[in-house]
């Protein structure tokens, strides 16, 4: 039986609106003996709230089966003084990090939110200039992810990758990306399932973050035609998925027949 990593946003829901068949698909995969881990770059809400949201959509899982980037950040940055430009809800997942306004060892950027007023607060010029000053003072730059955009019910929205790139350019330093598509993030998920990458699948809607990162680690990949999926992406993508399914609902049958 396979180890299967499942993206969340765009696979199970868009802006909280369920994509049909998600709960049933997870139940079928479990019944077939596959080991599952839910992997998300969502940095808007805490792991607890994200797990509750999935359960409300009919997807059965334990909180510990959900791997989020804030939890990964807490592990990597444990014991450090961190200036965090993140959404307030994820602070509960940053256990072991000392959050500071100045004198930071690290600057951590989180993801954007659908509510414009929160983005205006977190990614204001004042806050970005403060982060730049800390980087100039010797702090290291970390990003929960570097996504360009994400799909919402009202259309594509700019994500935090643009702000990360701006700080990288201004401070002339690369950011360490903690979420997908980083090898460390996928490695942690595979370790949790005790799986060799060659025996694992990554299922997602994001060609760059989901499929590209997984393929670079040696995993096989499946693209869903929901969420961020665009037909023209098939023509321009640098990573060719091993499979394409209409939605998460079609995954169990496809996996069962895959070579």
Functional labels for PLM-detected ranges:
Residues 2-34, 43-259:
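Asp-based, Mg2+/Mn2+-dependent phosphohydrolase catalytic module
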